[in-house]
Amino acid sequence: LNNRIFNIISIGLILCWIWADRHFQVGAPAYGWLLLIYVSVIFCGSYFIRWDFFLKSICSVKTNEKYIALSFDDGPAGIKTKKILEILKENNVEAAFFCIGKNLLGQEELLKTMIQEGHMIGNHSFSHHYLFDLFSSRKMLDDLQHMSRVCKDITGVSPRFFRPPYGVTNPNVKKTVLRGGFIAIGWSIRSYDTVIRNEERLLKKILSSLKPGAILLLHDTSEITANVLPRLLSGVRDRGYRMIRLDKMLNLNPYD
């Protein structure tokens, strides 16, 4: 079910309801329920990127092979990101970092280190503004292209993979992705590492959610993530999984 099909179904239901009201006097409250259901579905379709409601996003890979991809959002975040990079290097794991463009300024060497150590860089917008999903498609595209320019100036590469801020999608995000030639990336395992404060609970949540072809969402801005990462990597391997870089798992070129 996507936005277009849902709207067609909704129009059909409204017409049926109008017909029923004329013949059977369904009453005004019924229209209120219809509106509530419509708004609820639109909200969930925007919030849950895996629904593919407004925009087709890659959230996992269909496979029977036991491998997953690690992804980190919102960085780079100075010391926290450096600690995560050290742990990944020690464990010979390559990951995807969906960076915020404004965070790259002043941390150019850290971004270069990510590339040099075999990690992939993705576009997570330049501003990561809390009202990003309310931007016009033109403003969204300017924001994404700004991030891409900054990244290219520092590293020589311009990211194709884009993860929407907060994972929120809508028609304008879809227009932006199509016009900019981006590939929308979601996730199949949301760690909630920015919310969960108990390390054991965080580990249990992630490890119990593992499935072949999963994309795991983490944040290199979160201190608890760096603290649990060594045990997380061990736990993933103990369960027979390999960790490979996102673009390699998808077999797609991550840069223009």
What are these regions (language model features)?
Residues 1-70, 82, 86-96, 208-256:
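Terminal accessory/targeting
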Residues 42-135, 142-153, 157-158, 242, ...:
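Active-site beta->alpha N-cap acidic-glycine motif
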Residues 72-74, 99-101, 123-125, 164-166, ...:
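A cross-domain feature marking catalytic cores of carbohydrate-active enzymes
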Residues 73, 88, 97, 121, ...:
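Divalent metal-coordination and catalytic microenvironments
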Residues 83-84, 109-113, 172-176, 228-232:
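A short acidic, amphipathic alpha-helical/loop segment
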Residues 112-116, 138-142, 178-180, 202-205:
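Short, hinge-like loop/turn segments at secondary-structure boundaries
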Residues 133-138, 196-198:
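Short, solvent-exposed loop/turn segments at secondary-structure boundaries
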Residues 160, 168-170, 174-209, 241-252:
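His/Asp/Glu-enriched short active-site or ligand-binding loop at hydrolase and phosphoryl-transfer sites
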